[in-house]
Amino acid sequence: MARSLKKNPFVAFHLLEKVEKLNIRKEKEIIVTWSRASTIIPTMVGHTIAVHNGKEHLPVFITDRMVGHKLGEFAPTLTFRGHARNDNRSRR
């Protein structure tokens, strides 16, 4: 279910502060965050944000096509290791 248009998109306050500070200084640094639920807004375009996936921070370069999506969409949390082998010989 989508967020109501009456409300603004959710962006963690500390993340918004860091992005605004870098925009004012016109610097590009990697911003480390645990806030996977934050929505990507146009002021974040061009920055690299390291999003936590539960184990490590994955760097995500923000482009204009990502605006409106959540940060967590670009940092997968699960790794598929393959299905279990069909090893019937070991069970007998």
Curated annotation (Swiss-Prot):
It holds the Pfam family Ribosomal_S19. It is found in: Plastid, Chloroplast. Gene3D superfamilies: 30s Ribosomal Protein S19, Chain A. Its main location: plastid. Keywords: Chloroplast, Plastid, Ribonucleoprotein, Ribosomal protein, RNA-binding, rRNA-binding. The keyword Chloroplast applies. GO terms for molecular function: rRNA binding; structural constituent of ribosome. PANTHER family: RIBOSOMAL PROTEIN S19P FAMILY MEMBER, SMALL RIBOSOMAL SUBUNIT PROTEIN US19M. This is Small ribosomal subunit protein uS19c.
